[in-house]
Regions:
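Conserved G/P- and acidic residue-centered "switch" motifs that form tight phosphate/ATP-binding loops
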Residues: 135
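Active-site-proximal beta-strand elements of phosphoester/diester hydrolases
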Residues: 238-241
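N-terminal beta1-alpha1 cap of cysteine-dependent amidohydrolase-like domains
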Residues: 1-132, 143-147, 154-192, 198, ...
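The feature captures the ABC ATPase H-loop/switch
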Residues: 138
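A short, structured beta-strand/loop element
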Residues: 234-236
Length: 272
Protein backbone atom coordinates (compact mmCIF):
# COMPACT_ATOMS: atom_id res chain seq x y z
CA UNK A 1 0.00 0.00 0.00
CA UNK A 2 1.31 3.47 -0.93
CA UNK A 3 0.77 6.17 1.69
CA UNK A 4 0.31 9.86 0.83
CA UNK A 5 2.83 12.39 2.14
CA UNK A 6 0.04 14.41 3.70
CA UNK A 7 -3.70 14.46 4.23
CA UNK A 8 -5.96 17.50 3.77
CA UNK A 9 -8.79 17.77 6.31
CA UNK A 10 -11.00 20.70 5.37
CA UNK A 11 -8.70 23.71 5.19
CA UNK A 12 -6.03 22.08 7.37
CA UNK A 13 -3.07 20.15 6.02
CA UNK A 14 -1.88 17.38 8.34
CA UNK A 15 1.54 15.75 8.10
CA UNK A 16 1.21 12.06 7.36
CA UNK A 17 3.60 9.46 8.77
CA UNK A 18 3.95 5.74 8.20
CA UNK A 19 2.76 3.15 10.72
CA UNK A 20 5.22 1.82 13.30
CA UNK A 21 5.98 -1.88 13.73
CA UNK A 22 7.88 -3.10 16.79
CA UNK A 23 10.52 -5.78 16.13
CA UNK A 24 11.41 -7.98 19.11
CA UNK A 25 15.16 -8.24 19.76
CA UNK A 26 17.45 -11.14 20.51
CA UNK A 27 20.18 -10.82 23.11
CA UNK A 28 23.50 -11.45 21.38
CA UNK A 29 26.48 -12.34 23.56
CA UNK A 30 29.94 -11.15 22.49
CA UNK A 31 32.44 -12.01 25.18
CA UNK A 32 31.56 -10.06 28.31
CA UNK A 33 29.17 -7.81 26.37
CA UNK A 34 25.51 -8.29 25.48
CA UNK A 35 23.73 -6.58 22.60
CA UNK A 36 20.03 -6.33 21.81
CA UNK A 37 19.32 -6.55 18.10
CA UNK A 38 17.47 -7.96 15.11
CA UNK A 39 18.80 -9.05 11.72
CA UNK A 40 18.94 -6.51 8.92
CA UNK A 41 16.88 -8.76 6.65
CA UNK A 42 13.96 -8.47 9.08
CA UNK A 43 14.29 -4.69 9.25
CA UNK A 44 14.30 -4.44 5.45
CA UNK A 45 11.25 -6.68 5.10
CA UNK A 46 9.27 -4.55 7.56
CA UNK A 47 10.41 -1.26 6.02
CA UNK A 48 9.93 -2.23 2.38
CA UNK A 49 7.64 -5.27 2.43
CA UNK A 50 5.14 -3.98 5.01
CA UNK A 51 5.90 -0.32 4.19
CA UNK A 52 6.22 0.67 7.84
CA UNK A 53 8.77 2.14 10.23
CA UNK A 54 10.53 -0.63 12.22
CA UNK A 55 11.55 0.08 15.81
CA UNK A 56 13.45 -2.39 17.96
CA UNK A 57 11.95 -3.70 21.20
CA UNK A 58 14.75 -4.65 23.64
CA UNK A 59 14.51 -7.92 25.51
CA UNK A 60 12.87 -7.95 28.93
CA UNK A 61 16.06 -7.43 30.93
CA UNK A 62 19.26 -5.73 29.87
CA UNK A 63 21.45 -7.50 32.42
CA UNK A 64 21.02 -8.55 36.02
CA UNK A 65 22.37 -5.22 37.28
CA UNK A 66 19.76 -3.17 35.39
CA UNK A 67 16.02 -2.72 35.75
CA UNK A 68 13.58 -4.83 33.81
CA UNK A 69 12.34 -3.04 30.72
CA UNK A 70 8.83 -3.82 31.88
CA UNK A 71 9.23 -0.86 34.26
CA UNK A 72 8.87 1.55 31.34
CA UNK A 73 7.94 -0.54 28.30
CA UNK A 74 4.43 -1.11 29.60
CA UNK A 75 1.11 -2.11 28.09
CA UNK A 76 0.10 1.48 27.34
CA UNK A 77 3.30 2.15 25.42
CA UNK A 78 3.06 -1.16 23.57
CA UNK A 79 -0.50 -0.29 22.64
CA UNK A 80 0.76 2.70 20.65
CA UNK A 81 2.41 0.38 18.13
CA UNK A 82 0.57 -0.33 14.89
CA UNK A 83 2.01 -3.83 14.56
CA UNK A 84 4.59 -6.18 16.03
CA UNK A 85 6.97 -8.64 14.37
CA UNK A 86 8.59 -11.65 16.06
CA UNK A 87 11.60 -12.71 13.96
CA UNK A 88 13.55 -15.92 13.74
CA UNK A 89 16.60 -16.55 15.90
CA UNK A 90 19.37 -19.12 16.48
CA UNK A 91 17.96 -19.55 20.00
CA UNK A 92 15.09 -21.74 21.21
CA UNK A 93 12.28 -21.10 23.68
CA UNK A 94 13.12 -22.56 27.09
CA UNK A 95 11.06 -25.78 27.36
CA UNK A 96 9.72 -25.08 30.84
CA UNK A 97 7.40 -22.57 29.15
CA UNK A 98 5.57 -25.49 27.52
CA UNK A 99 5.72 -28.03 30.33
CA UNK A 100 9.02 -29.80 29.60
CA UNK A 101 11.41 -29.84 32.54
CA UNK A 102 14.61 -30.81 30.69
CA UNK A 103 16.13 -29.00 27.72
CA UNK A 104 17.62 -31.10 24.92
CA UNK A 105 19.65 -28.06 23.83
CA UNK A 106 20.57 -26.24 27.08
CA UNK A 107 23.06 -23.87 25.42
CA UNK A 108 20.61 -22.60 22.80
CA UNK A 109 18.26 -20.44 24.85
CA UNK A 110 17.60 -16.71 25.13
CA UNK A 111 15.81 -16.29 28.44
CA UNK A 112 15.55 -12.54 28.03
CA UNK A 113 13.79 -12.81 24.68
CA UNK A 114 11.39 -15.37 26.18
CA UNK A 115 10.63 -12.78 28.85
CA UNK A 116 9.64 -10.24 26.21
CA UNK A 117 8.06 -12.28 23.44
CA UNK A 118 5.68 -14.54 25.34
CA UNK A 119 3.83 -11.80 27.29
CA UNK A 120 3.93 -9.38 24.33
CA UNK A 121 2.25 -11.94 22.07
CA UNK A 122 -0.62 -12.27 24.54
CA UNK A 123 -0.83 -8.49 24.87
CA UNK A 124 -0.85 -7.97 21.10
CA UNK A 125 -3.72 -10.42 20.65
CA UNK A 126 -5.60 -8.89 23.59
CA UNK A 127 -5.25 -5.36 22.17
CA UNK A 128 -5.85 -6.38 18.56
CA UNK A 129 -2.38 -5.31 17.40
CA UNK A 130 -1.52 -7.03 14.09
CA UNK A 131 1.17 -9.65 14.61
CA UNK A 132 3.47 -11.53 12.26
CA UNK A 133 5.89 -14.19 13.49
CA UNK A 134 8.59 -16.16 11.65
CA UNK A 135 10.48 -19.35 12.60
CA UNK A 136 11.22 -19.03 16.35
CA UNK A 137 8.54 -16.33 16.36
CA UNK A 138 5.90 -18.83 15.22
CA UNK A 139 7.03 -21.24 17.93
CA UNK A 140 6.72 -18.41 20.48
CA UNK A 141 3.18 -17.70 19.27
CA UNK A 142 2.25 -21.34 19.79
CA UNK A 143 3.88 -21.55 23.24
CA UNK A 144 2.34 -18.25 24.38
CA UNK A 145 -1.08 -19.74 23.61
CA UNK A 146 -0.38 -22.93 25.57
CA UNK A 147 1.04 -25.16 22.82
CA UNK A 148 4.00 -27.56 23.00
CA UNK A 149 7.08 -27.98 20.80
CA UNK A 150 9.22 -30.85 19.57
CA UNK A 151 12.67 -30.03 20.92
CA UNK A 152 14.55 -32.07 18.29
CA UNK A 153 12.61 -32.88 15.13
CA UNK A 154 15.61 -34.72 13.73
CA UNK A 155 15.27 -37.40 16.43
CA UNK A 156 11.78 -38.31 15.21
CA UNK A 157 11.75 -40.66 12.21
CA UNK A 158 8.44 -39.39 10.83
CA UNK A 159 9.92 -36.01 9.94
CA UNK A 160 12.09 -35.01 7.02
CA UNK A 161 15.24 -32.96 7.64
CA UNK A 162 14.08 -29.42 8.41
CA UNK A 163 17.48 -27.99 9.27
CA UNK A 164 19.61 -26.07 6.80
CA UNK A 165 22.85 -27.43 5.35
CA UNK A 166 25.51 -26.02 7.66
CA UNK A 167 28.17 -26.56 4.98
CA UNK A 168 26.34 -24.44 2.39
CA UNK A 169 26.81 -20.71 1.91
CA UNK A 170 24.12 -18.34 3.13
CA UNK A 171 22.24 -18.39 -0.17
CA UNK A 172 22.33 -22.18 -0.16
CA UNK A 173 21.01 -22.39 3.38
CA UNK A 174 18.01 -20.24 2.48
CA UNK A 175 17.20 -22.04 -0.77
CA UNK A 176 13.73 -23.53 -1.25
CA UNK A 177 13.60 -26.84 0.63
CA UNK A 178 10.10 -28.30 0.48
CA UNK A 179 6.50 -27.58 -0.37
CA UNK A 180 3.84 -26.55 2.14
CA UNK A 181 0.15 -27.32 1.68
CA UNK A 182 -2.01 -24.36 2.65
CA UNK A 183 -5.32 -24.95 4.42
CA UNK A 184 -8.18 -24.49 1.96
CA UNK A 185 -9.98 -21.17 2.54
CA UNK A 186 -7.51 -20.35 5.30
CA UNK A 187 -6.02 -16.92 5.89
CA UNK A 188 -2.70 -17.80 4.24
CA UNK A 189 -4.31 -19.47 1.22
CA UNK A 190 -6.54 -16.45 0.71
CA UNK A 191 -3.56 -14.08 1.00
CA UNK A 192 -1.60 -16.05 -1.62
CA UNK A 193 -4.48 -17.13 -3.83
CA UNK A 194 -3.24 -20.72 -4.14
CA UNK A 195 -3.09 -23.89 -2.03
CA UNK A 196 0.62 -24.74 -2.01
CA UNK A 197 4.02 -23.08 -2.19
CA UNK A 198 7.73 -23.87 -1.92
CA UNK A 199 9.48 -22.54 1.20
CA UNK A 200 12.92 -22.53 2.81
CA UNK A 201 13.60 -24.52 5.99
CA UNK A 202 16.10 -23.66 8.74
CA UNK A 203 14.74 -25.07 12.01
CA UNK A 204 15.36 -27.96 14.36
CA UNK A 205 12.21 -27.55 16.47
CA UNK A 206 8.53 -27.50 15.57
CA UNK A 207 4.98 -27.53 16.84
CA UNK A 208 3.93 -30.70 18.68
CA UNK A 209 0.55 -29.60 20.06
CA UNK A 210 -1.36 -26.55 18.88
CA UNK A 211 -2.02 -23.68 21.29
CA UNK A 212 -5.53 -22.60 22.28
CA UNK A 213 -7.29 -20.19 19.95
CA UNK A 214 -4.99 -21.09 17.04
CA UNK A 215 -5.66 -22.86 13.76
CA UNK A 216 -3.34 -24.53 11.26
CA UNK A 217 -2.63 -22.59 8.06
CA UNK A 218 -0.08 -24.91 6.42
CA UNK A 219 1.55 -28.34 6.70
CA UNK A 220 4.88 -29.72 5.50
CA UNK A 221 4.84 -32.96 3.44
CA UNK A 222 5.64 -34.95 6.61
CA UNK A 223 2.63 -33.53 8.45
CA UNK A 224 4.54 -30.99 10.55
CA UNK A 225 2.64 -27.76 11.17
CA UNK A 226 4.29 -24.99 9.12
CA UNK A 227 1.95 -22.02 9.68
CA UNK A 228 -0.68 -20.97 12.22
CA UNK A 229 -3.05 -18.09 12.86
CA UNK A 230 -5.48 -16.79 15.47
CA UNK A 231 -9.01 -18.11 15.11
CA UNK A 232 -10.38 -14.75 16.31
CA UNK A 233 -10.89 -12.81 13.08
CA UNK A 234 -10.71 -9.50 14.94
CA UNK A 235 -7.02 -10.11 15.62
CA UNK A 236 -4.57 -10.51 12.71
CA UNK A 237 -1.95 -12.88 14.14
CA UNK A 238 -0.11 -15.26 11.85
CA UNK A 239 3.06 -17.30 12.26
CA UNK A 240 5.08 -19.19 9.66
CA UNK A 241 7.88 -21.69 10.30
CA UNK A 242 9.96 -20.62 7.31
CA UNK A 243 11.79 -17.32 6.72
CA UNK A 244 9.58 -15.06 4.56
CA UNK A 245 11.96 -12.12 5.00
CA UNK A 246 14.58 -13.83 2.81
CA UNK A 247 14.25 -12.43 -0.74
CA UNK A 248 10.78 -11.22 0.28
CA UNK A 249 10.41 -9.06 -2.81
CA UNK A 250 11.14 -11.98 -5.16
CA UNK A 251 8.95 -14.65 -3.58
CA UNK A 252 5.22 -14.51 -4.29
CA UNK A 253 4.10 -15.78 -0.89
CA UNK A 254 6.54 -13.60 1.06
CA UNK A 255 5.55 -10.49 -0.89
CA UNK A 256 1.86 -11.21 -0.33
CA UNK A 257 2.38 -12.00 3.37
CA UNK A 258 4.26 -8.81 4.20
CA UNK A 259 1.79 -6.75 2.15
CA UNK A 260 -1.17 -8.29 4.00
CA UNK A 261 0.57 -7.59 7.32
CA UNK A 262 1.30 -4.02 6.24
CA UNK A 263 -2.32 -3.51 5.19
CA UNK A 264 -3.59 -4.63 8.61
CA UNK A 265 -1.03 -2.41 10.33
CA UNK A 266 -2.16 0.52 8.19
CA UNK A 267 -5.80 -0.06 9.17
CA UNK A 268 -4.88 0.18 12.86
CA UNK A 269 -2.76 3.25 12.17
CA UNK A 270 -5.70 5.02 10.51
CA UNK A 271 -8.05 4.20 13.39
CA UNK A 272 -5.98 6.14 15.91
Amino acid sequence: MDYPDRVVLGENEVNFKKPIIGVVCDVIKNGANSFHGAGEKYINAIAHGANAIPILIPAKTAGEDLKSLSDFFDADFFGQLDGVFFPGSPSNVEPHHYGNEKSATPDSHDRQRDGSSLPLIKLAIEKGIPLLAACRGMQELNVAMGGELYQQLYNHEQFIEHRENKEADRKGQYQLAHEVSLTANGLLANILGQNSHQVNSLHGQGIKTLGQGLTVEAYAPDGLIEAISCIDESSFAIGVQWHPEWNFSQDKLSTALFKAFGDEVYKRFMQK
